[in-house]
Amino acid sequence: MRIGTMIGADGANNTLDDIINVAKRAEAAGLDNVWLANIFGFDAISTLAIVGRETDRIGLGTAVTPTYPRHPTAIAQQALTTAAASKNRFTLGIGLSHQVVIENMLGMSYDKPAKHMREYLEVLMPLTRGETVNYDGDQYSVHGLALDVPGADRMPVVVAALGPVMLKIAGELADGTNTWMVGPNTMAKHIVPGLGRSDATVVGGVPIVLTTNIDQARETIGKNLVMYGQLPSYRAMLDREGVEGPQDIAIIGDENTLRGEIKRFEDAGVTDFNAAIMDVEEGAYDRTLEFLSSMK
């Protein structure tokens, strides 16, 4: 199992230079990859193109970029450019986002999200392979389009798929799934089998911190990540795991605890562990990164 970390999502390291420096630290620590969320700050795909020019080895991925505001041909072109810029270390992670964002904030329709993702991938995936697309769907229509991005190989594409229909689509059309707030039991019994294939990429992202102040860390994480317990898709995963909130999914404790919990994700079928380090107290980020480095 590859071990990576989330960058640019802790609220402190939020300038472009900070994100680059954190990625460099992760690379120096020997981690396999870094993952960047696309929320309301820097564009994740563009940022990782820059990170790719400033690093040498570490894998780069979006976790994730929303599909609705971006035509699949546009995101394919942008992603292939980032693949070329990073010498093909880039993994494109895409997702639907959430109904409250797409409808209430962006004023777009969130009708038939699974159909949207199927059509999106049916346009996107051939473009990443250098093929010419001729496609007529209900939401997208593309004719005679091919992309030529020198230096860009076909990149892995993972979908933020949690429900059974989306998992089936991700397994059928993409390379796997990129998850967040999914516990090891749900991963083993629902996510991995739901993809329907043995060679799928399964990214498991969870909060993590190395600390002896367990109760304080749980309380802080619960407060800081409270919204993830309220969004329907994540709430469903927490309920499947039988836990109350994000603080119960988080991996918190000493080195033995962290090592054992990470092993549970590996045993569940996760191929890429995405450690979202929670800087809940002074020195927590550095300690946790050093611990993750020791596992390599």
Predicted segments with their positions:
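Active-site-adjacent structural elements that line small-molecule/cofactor binding pockets in enzymes
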Residues: M1-K296
